[in-house]
């Protein structure tokens, strides 16, 4: 791994940790800027490095560094309803970066962003449901789980996607060579 790659991965992990703290603490999952950071990671890094940035972030939190929302961290985070979303960051960023390889058009950024957003929800919502219903003893319906973990987030996710596309279109040519 080149020094430039290590630096970019570290910067993206730091961005993700910072964006995690910019939150509105609602239950069961806070509204944060984490997904903005995940979009930027997928837009700016190679698939391998994007996956790695998500993995490093998750490991840092699990070993106790307060990088998760609300300055939380530790192995107990694993049983948080929000942890499925954290798990999803690796796959989401990696798949978005994979799709975007060699593509530069606005349409491709939007598609990559939608892929990343979908992956985040496809992993995060079932995990949240398992924790809430299985571990916490709630008896939420599928609709109630969607109302808690998806519906309130859609407007903000669309705004974050638009912002990430604008930022990445400006930053990517300066930061990333397509040979990554």
How should these model regions be labeled?
Residues 69-77, 136-152:
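Active-site-proximal inter-transmembrane loops
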Residues 20-33, 58-92:
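Interfacial aromatic-anchored transmembrane helix boundaries in multi-pass membrane proteins
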Residues 7, 11, 18, 75-122:
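Short helix-perturbing small/polar motifs within transmembrane alpha-helices
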Residues 23, 27, 68, 72, ...:
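Membrane-interfacial segments
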Residues 6-10, 36, 40, 50-56, ...:
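Hydrophobic alpha-helical transmembrane segments
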Residues 1-51:
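Hydrophobic transmembrane alpha-helices
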Residues 1-10, 144-180:
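Alpha-helical transmembrane segments and their cytosolic interface
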Residues 15, 19, 23, 41, ...:
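Alpha-helical membrane-inserting segments
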């Amino acid at each position: 791994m080149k020094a430039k790659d290590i630096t970019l991965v570290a910067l993206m992990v730091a961005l993700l940790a910072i964006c995690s703290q910019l939150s509105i603490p609602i239950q069961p999952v806070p509204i944060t800027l984490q997904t903005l950071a995940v979009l930027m990671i997928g837009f700016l890094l190679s698939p391998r490095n994007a996956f790695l940035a998500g993995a490093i972030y998750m490991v840092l939190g699990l070993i106790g560094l307060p990088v998760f929302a609300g300055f939380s961290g530790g192995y107990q985070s694993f049983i948080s309803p929000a942890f499925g979303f954290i798990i999803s960051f690796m796959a989401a960023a990696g798949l978005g970066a994979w799709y975007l390889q060699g593509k530069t058009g606005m349409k491709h950024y939007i598609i990559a962003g939608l892929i990343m957003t979908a992956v985040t929800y496809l992993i995060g919502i079932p995990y949240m449901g398992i924790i809430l219903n299985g571990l916490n003893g709630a008896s939420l319906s599928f609709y109630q789980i969607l109302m808690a973990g998806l519906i309130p987030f859609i407007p903000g996710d669309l705004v974050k996607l638009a912002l990430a596309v604008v930022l990445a279109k400006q930053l990517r040519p300066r930061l990333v060579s397509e040979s990554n």
